[in-house]
């Protein structure tokens, strides 16, 4: 609670409450439109799979969702860093875990909260659920009960049972240690390791490190009472006893003398600079206490510039984050129907993650983390959490280990086919907003000008931007009006870190007026007209700030129509050379991540304009790390209608052909991407339908749709945004010489923040 200020707390509550409360819902995977569908789904048709399963229990994987279903189960006795909150209060966390399973590995997960602190009662409640799920993820159960619960359930159930608080941390830690040892020319068996904190994660770390080859006699485990040594009686249990050291050392300070490795799973401030200074040459320091590490990387580097450092935090390099493990470990285990997650599978996961860090980083990952050096070395020993390769690399390694160790039920297994399946299961663009956030966090923050700074949603978005450290917000408005609006949002909210600019009181009015007059003097504007615009029109003033270098990006639109806002800004900021102003939206769905353009500007584009929009949108896709497959959309497909309205679309394809064949640039952009048209949306997105047109040039489903006109583009994107469950981002403005985003008048604070994130990234590219 201390780490969450009032606005974040309120925003979090609103996020969980709005629309349908919570974060997960059940959706159907089969059609339920007709009476026949209903008869097949339930009575009498459902009897058929029931009878087949009764004959052969393995058929449950064939006819039900069990093969892709995980239960996230807790009793709430160790909720995050909040302690014993109880079963009901743990539910938001368990729902969040279920969301991560779906987002990162396409695993359906459901949360179950068991209202008991008695380990035996908990075990009895869970053990009978085996036929319902393909795996069990235990979460937020306090030690030492968590050890007993996991051990017993693993012995009673024939599906994977995995306590992520233990093993997830252990696996990512092991991956980092494998690479850190390699970089410092050490072997695992020779490492002298000190671990501070003797809870679930620490015990699991020791188990896995020993399995990897670390010498047990060279590990010293400490807790709040000091070294866990043989003969100690205070604060002991059988799990600590297992790793009690035969040593005369009694304190953490003594333990760190000449130690090679420190693994912290304890509390902030547990380690001092003096302790670190006495470690061995090239020390390996994993300070993973959350939210604040045992010692900060800055303090470590102050005394040991030869150290390799990892933490649990995303704002430092080498983040030990469980999300790199558990979704993909379960993915691999489920896909081969493993009966357990054994040590061999955990080792395989750790080694796969370690190996991935040594590989060249693909362009889409590098772009997402712009400004960060991602070459295997001291600052990059662990992959970044949003590396889309993780699902293929880790899940495959786990699946193979399950088969080789004899715990997999699936015997007919092709590694190559499995990798292809995993690659198509999740598209990298599904995590694009996270990529943007990481890119922003790796460079100096940009100044983002919010023209309509007196509006509640705009102020809320600016506050979120400040708190998330996405940028330095500048809001245009009158202080007294802003303060009134701020009180509506919540009391005791500070605007610290947000700059307020009142256009009428600015000391830059003369400079901005001079700039604007030079642009408009031959367009019917007198100097006094320009002075009035700068002083009274918030869009003009904000645009002048960006044009004159006093801001890096501009957001506006919630108080004016898109076209009115566009007309204001175009007076101040021109289109980029060889670019047209256009709008696009991104639809992020399970099977398709699609860019739709132009849904903002050109009402009825001619053939050349369509070709230009296609080329520019393909460039946008490339900048997002997407290989563009462009479809020029119509109601007809490849000439099956001779109506005149489709001719311009075919002509646009011919224009693209000519530029592609002659290797010429269209508006300064190479036509070196896949494209075709005219075609219907169904053909563009449906592989089976495209088979009817074997000449179609698209190698896969289109991921860029160029709409034939503004009406169809705007209507289709608004319908998708309103009625589908797909994630939807936009409209996003592209083509100005400076970063400008024009918002919908209905934009919420979260939607404004999303678009502002694009503005931040665009501003980074301006440098």
Swiss-Prot record:
It catalyses: (S)-malate + NADP(+) = pyruvate + CO2 + NADPH; oxaloacetate + H(+) = pyruvate + CO2. NADP(+) binds at residues 198-201, 290, 322. It comes from the Bacteria. InterPro entries: Aminoacid_DH-like_N_sf (IPR046346), Malate_Decarboxylase (IPR051674), Malic_enzyme_CS (IPR015884), Malic_N_dom (IPR012301), Malic_N_dom_sf (IPR037062), Malic_NAD-bd (IPR012302), Malic_NAD-bd_bact_type (IPR045213), ME_PTA (IPR012188). SMART domains: malic, Malic_M. PROSITE patterns: MALIC_ENZYMES. Its cofactor is Mg(2+); Mn(2+). A divalent metal cation binds at residues 139-140, 165. Its EC number is 1.1.1.40. Residues 1-430 are annotated as: Malic enzyme. Residues 431-767 are annotated as: Phosphate acetyltransferase. Keywords: Metal-binding, Multifunctional enzyme, NADP, Oxidoreductase. GO terms for molecular function: acyltransferase activity; malate dehydrogenase (decarboxylating) (NADP+) activity; metal ion binding; NAD binding; oxaloacetate decarboxylase activity. SUPFAM superfamilies: Aminoacid dehydrogenase-like, N-terminal domain, Isocitrate/Isopropylmalate dehydrogenase-like, NAD(P)-binding Rossmann-fold domains. Signal peptide: none annotated. Divalent metal cations. Prefers magnesium or manganese. The active site is at residues 42, 97. PANTHER family: NADP-DEPENDENT MALIC ENZYME. In the N-terminal section; belongs to the malic enzymes family. This is Probable NADP-dependent malic enzyme. It comes from Rickettsia prowazekii (strain Madrid E).
